[in-house]
């Protein structure tokens, strides 16, 4: 991800700083991928965009996030969008779409925000409830997308853990004023390291068969990290030896964010150690067999540590590269994705 900074003083949504980040310009990679795809004669490369947060001055906490600590019982937050800036934030998203279009890149899908339930203040986020996202789409983002001068992106609601999809679907799909703007829902896999929640997909599809379900993010997270503050870690487990080592990927040597936590509302029994190859294969196959129309890994390629990542949330990826030596490692999950993409 990258940041598009806008200043509150004199902010005008007619003026936009552009999408070229000096340190992390995505456009060359996207253009190269589009060129490759165009020569294949298959379906278009579809890009889904998801902002992690509004600019800080649009939020109640006036910051990117507040970390969890002993002072707040380790309950960090990303804050919420101030109601007076709902229209401004919606126009900010539209300007992003237009900026990419001016560069020759059509964004296929859009979510109102990444992970609206938050991440306990570990990095940038912004919270919505089903009700507040419903109102935001109904009165602000939806109408603006309807007015989009060319082909508008498909709007995907939610974009967080699968287990709570039903509540969001019932609230938003159940409101026809909002549902008219929506293509479907986006989900992630982080609420368990082995459960797929296919029963949730079945129930949502049974009630709302006209709406798509797309898995927009999953990865091996917290790779080689210590347990976070406020989490019990009696075994002191920490991954190691994943680069140029297929054995790591085929055996139960990976853990996720909730492997040993004792936070309220988190069942650590749903987060046992796992074999990355098996988790990927099972999750993709079961998801596609239960109405999920597409499955996207969070990363394409990372360095050998699992970064770069500005908050140290190192992750596994299909391709990992030692930037010092230039050694390229196609991990076993690369071949899982390759096989299931055929």
Model-derived regions: residue spans:
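N-terminal catalytic cores of secreted or lumenal carbohydrate-active enzymes
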Residues: 1-108, 128-131, 139-142
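Active-site neighborhood of glycoside hydrolase catalytic domains
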Residues: 85-112, 116-226, 230-254
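Short acidic/His/Gly/Ser-rich catalytic and metal-binding motifs that mark active-site loops
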Residues: 2, 55-72, 116-122, 165-167, ...
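Short glycine-enriched loops at secondary-structure junctions
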Residues: 51-56, 113, 161, 301
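A short helix->loop->beta-strand "cap" motif at the edges of active sites that frequently abuts
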Residues: 38, 42-45, 153, 208-211, ...
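Extracytoplasmic/secreted proteins, especially bacterial periplasmic and envelope-associated proteins
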Residues: 25-28, 32, 84, 88-95, ...
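A structural signal for short, well-ordered beta-strand segments and their strand-loop junctions
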Residues: 47-49, 109-112, 215, 295-297
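Aromatic/acidic polysaccharide-binding cleft in carbohydrate-active enzymes
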Residues: 215-339
């Amino acid at each position: 991800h990258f940041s598009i900074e806008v200043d509150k003083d004199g902010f005008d949504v007619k003026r936009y700083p552009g999408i070229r980040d000096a340190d992390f310009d995505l456009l060359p990679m996207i253009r190269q991928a589009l060129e490759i795809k165009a020569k294949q004669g298959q379906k278009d490369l579809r890009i889904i965009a998801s902002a992690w947060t509004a600019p800080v001055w649009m939020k109640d906490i006036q910051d990117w996030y507040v970390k969890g600590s002993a002072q707040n019982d380790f309950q960090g937050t990303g804050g919420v969008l101030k109601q007076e800036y709902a229209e401004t934030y919606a126009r900010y998203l539209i300007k992003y779409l237009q900026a990419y279009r001016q560069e020759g890149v059509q964004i296929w899908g859009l979510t109102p925000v990444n992970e609206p339930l938050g991440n306990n203040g570990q990095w940038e986020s912004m919270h919505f409830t089903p009700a507040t996202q419903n109102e935001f789409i109904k009165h602000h983002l939806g109408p603006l997308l309807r007015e989009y001068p060319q082909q508008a992106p498909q709007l995907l609601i939610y974009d967080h853990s699968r287990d709570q999809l039903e509540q969001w679907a019932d609230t938003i799909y159940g409101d026809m004023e909002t549902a008219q703007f929506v293509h479907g829902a986006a989900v992630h896999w982080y609420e368990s390291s082995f459960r797929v929640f296919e029963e949730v997909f079945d129930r949502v599809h049974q009630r709302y068969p006209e709406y798509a379900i797309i898995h927009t993010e999953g990865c091996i997270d917290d790779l080689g990290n210590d347990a976070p503050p406020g989490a019990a870690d009696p075994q002191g487990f920490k991954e190691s030896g994943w680069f140029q080592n297929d054995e790591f990927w085929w055996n139960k040597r990976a853990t996720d964010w909730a492997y040993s936590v004792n936070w309220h509302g988190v069942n650590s029994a749903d987060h046992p150690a796992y074999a990355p190859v098996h988790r990927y294969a099972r999750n993709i196959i079961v998801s596609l067999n239960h109405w999920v129309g597409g499955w996207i890994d969070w990363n394409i390629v990372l360095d050998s540590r699992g970064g770069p990542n500005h908050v140290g949330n190192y992750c596994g990826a299909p391709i990992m590269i030692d930037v010092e030596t230039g050694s390229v490692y196609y991990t076993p999950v690369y071949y899982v994705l390759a096989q299931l993409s055929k």
